[in-house]
């Protein structure tokens, strides 16, 4: 795992104690979520509690970078915190290098702010450790009580503004999705997106029917100014095919994930 390898490569031996505490705190936490806000607090809280435990500042690359770029990071996080696109924030050491894992930094700062603004420090620690990450409202209440953001957060507007920038699938070619008379001689399938896409990331999976219904043999690459993905396919006559395009990795060049979590491509040959 390159991400994990990079994490340890950037740690000194002095940080091993902190890492052990960080991982132990994870065993005491409740729930999980694929939303940037929830997962960032979940990770950052482990760093903050570890720092309280060892009674000295922890030193990591993301904390150092984060503190030196606080304003711009906070603004970007606010735009993306209600999304499920981790690309700019978590587990991205193999792509982002020095500005990787900044969700840890933001989560740490949110927890630190919550703690500093709490009159009862013991209760604050309990709140941080026992926060239920499956409960979006509880996580949002925690954020608001932390006073990490000075201004009021308009969740509806943030989500609306983010979704305006998300790419979507316009169509597939050379036949329409769910067609039932596709020529089995076809060797290419094209997916057309609404925006120029990041060509480094793909997330295509089997449908519930599994491997036998999966027609793709290879990802050929992008064309049409990176708005069209070309897939090589191998088809047989009178057979159903289907697969799922997900937003786990597909994103625009601006870093916005696909608006649909899953898009099923389904068709049948003649």
Language-model segments: what does each one mean?
Residues 78-173:
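Pan-zinc metallopeptidase signature
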Residues 21, 43-50, 108-111, 125, ...:
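Extracytoplasmic/secreted envelope proteins and their assembly/folding machinery
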Residues 25-33, 50-58, 112-119, 198, ...:
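Sec-exported extracytoplasmic/periplasmic mature domains
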Residues 1-63:
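Acidic/His-rich structured neighborhood in mature extracellular/periplasmic domains
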Residues 75-77, 110-111, 193, 241:
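Short, Φ-rich (hydrophobic/aromatic) sequence segments
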């Amino acid at each position: 795992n390159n991400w994990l390898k990079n994490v340890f490569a950037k740690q000194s031996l002095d940080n091993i104690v902190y890492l052990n505490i960080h991982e132990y705190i994870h065993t005491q936490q409740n729930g999980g979520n694929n939303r940037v806000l929830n997962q960032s607090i979940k990770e950052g809280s482990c760093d903050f509690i570890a720092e309280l435990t060892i009674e000295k500042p922890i030193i990591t690359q993301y904390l150092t970078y984060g503190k030196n770029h606080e304003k711009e990071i906070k603004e970007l996080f606010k735009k993306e915190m209600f999304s499920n696109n981790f690309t700019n924030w978590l587990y991205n050491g193999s792509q982002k290098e020095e500005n990787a894992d900044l969700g840890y930094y933001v989560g740490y700062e949110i927890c630190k702010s919550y703690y500093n603004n709490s009159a009862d420090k013991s209760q604050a620690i309990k709140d941080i450790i026992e926060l239920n990450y499956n409960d979006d409202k509880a996580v949002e209440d925690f954020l608001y009580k932390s006073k990490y953001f000075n201004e009021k957060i308009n969740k509806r507007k943030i989500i609306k503004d983010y979704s305006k920038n998300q790419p979507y699938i316009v169509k597939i070619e050379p036949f329409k999705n769910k067609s039932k008379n596709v020529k089995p001689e076809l060797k290419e399938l094209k997916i057309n997106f609404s925006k120029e896409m990041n060509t480094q990331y793909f997330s295509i999976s089997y449908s519930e029917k599994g491997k036998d219904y999966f027609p793709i043999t290879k990802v050929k690459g992008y064309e049409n100014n990176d708005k069209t993905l070309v897939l090589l396919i191998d088809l047989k006559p009178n057979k159903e095919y289907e697969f799922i395009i997900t937003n786990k990795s597909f994103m625009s060049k601006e870093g916005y994930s696909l608006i649909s979590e899953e898009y099923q491509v389904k068709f049948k040959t003649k």
